[in-house]
Design a protein with these regions (language model features):
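Class I SAM-dependent methyltransferase SAM/SAH-binding core
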Residues: 52, 58-102
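C-terminal alpha-helical "lid/dimerization" subdomain adjacent to the S-adenosyl-L-methionine
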Residues: 148-183
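A conserved beta-strand element that flanks and buttresses the S-adenosyl-L-methionine
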Residues: 116
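Short catalytic micro-motifs in class I SAM-dependent methyltransferases
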Residues: 119-120
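Phosphate-coordination loops involved in phosphoryl transfer and adenosine-cofactor binding
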Residues: 48
Length: 183
């Protein structure tokens, strides 16, 4: 996995890199735009508009919520990505921190109508994902929802086929979801 310095270096070309991967239907961002659009519609359908974004990157999705008048909160571990996102959303409350170690205290002091995690949870082991998601649930308002968009596969076979097709582009440090076939 890239460390925060790696993401800082990638930040200025991140949006273009994601777009090219999606346009070419290539790992890891194949289907990115469609997933983000679907998630965007679901979040806006929520009754309130306090949104927490975990690992928001350059703010591709989060800035769309911001433009619709949502109150934006977020945590990312790349200072450069935060800088780029903050320029798109001057009033957003964005914090730097490694969410694998938990949220910064300022974010834990709020409650949210929607918590969004896109292309971020794959940095956690399955056990860490479960613990982190459990820690997020009390931060949701009564009718709040948690939305996850990430690389995932219907079967282990699909995951292995993608790994083979991606070749040297495959990031073996990332932990993607795929159910195990029954034996």
């Amino acid at each position: 996995m890239l460390n925060n310095t790696g993401f800082d270096l990638w930040a200025d070309g991140y949006d273009k890199s994601v777009g090219l991967s999606d346009e070419n239907d290539r790992y890891p961002f194949a289907g990115y735009r469609a997933m983000m659009n679907a998630l965007y519609q679901r979040v806006l359908a929520q009754s309130g508009h306090n949104v927490l974004d975990i690992g928001f990157g350059t703010g591709i999705l989060t800035s769309r919520f911001y433009e619709q008048g949502c109150r934006i909160y977020g945590q990312d571990f790349s200072a450069r990505m935060i800088e780029l996102a903050q320029a798109k959303m001057p009033d957003a409350r964005l914090y730097q921190g490694d969410f694998s170690k938990g949220l910064v205290p300022e974010l834990c002091a709020q409650q949210y109508d929607a918590i969004v995690a896109t292309y971020s949870l794959h940095h956690l082991t399955d056990a860490q994902k479960i613990g982190f998601l459990r820690a997020l649930l009390p931060l949701l308002k009564q009718d709040g929802c948690l939305f996850i968009g990430d690389v995932a596969f219907r079967t282990r076979e699909e995951l292995e086929a993608c790994r083979t097709a991606a070749g040297e582009d495959w990031d073996s440090d990332e932990i993607y979801s795929a159910p195990t076939s029954p034996r």
